[in-house]
């Protein structure tokens, strides 16, 4: 029996990413987390697009990132909306328009790499509301969960065996964006103590 560390690391990271859904939802229910509706619904749609585009070029452990993210963001978005905990601002409308524009451009091209790039651009446009919200209120997002998410996605990237732009672009972008949000949550906690 061969020991394939890629499989073990990928499986462990996938379990971690799935497990993070529960404490995040608990933090929404307890009102300690106030998610941006635009970000979470936008992420659900865009992760689904990235999953399909990435899968069209081959299935690898890195596919777990957009696939699990599609599932988790959809659950979180509907939970926040149902409980009335979702935050909505006028700037979110601009981000929605930019996201729709990027999705439209992807639909016109139908090329997987272009789809991934446009989904990253659209993702950034729906991530901005969460970045702004977290900058303004660092306690509105749970630091530990964002750090664990970064660790999980990074582990998925390390577990990949196909180091191509198709398999790495979106997960690496996700690591960077999530690390920014995590850093903002810590920034607020450190300044609050000072």
Can you say where each PLM-predicted feature lies in the sequence?
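Alpha-helical membrane-protein topology signature
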Residues: 1-194
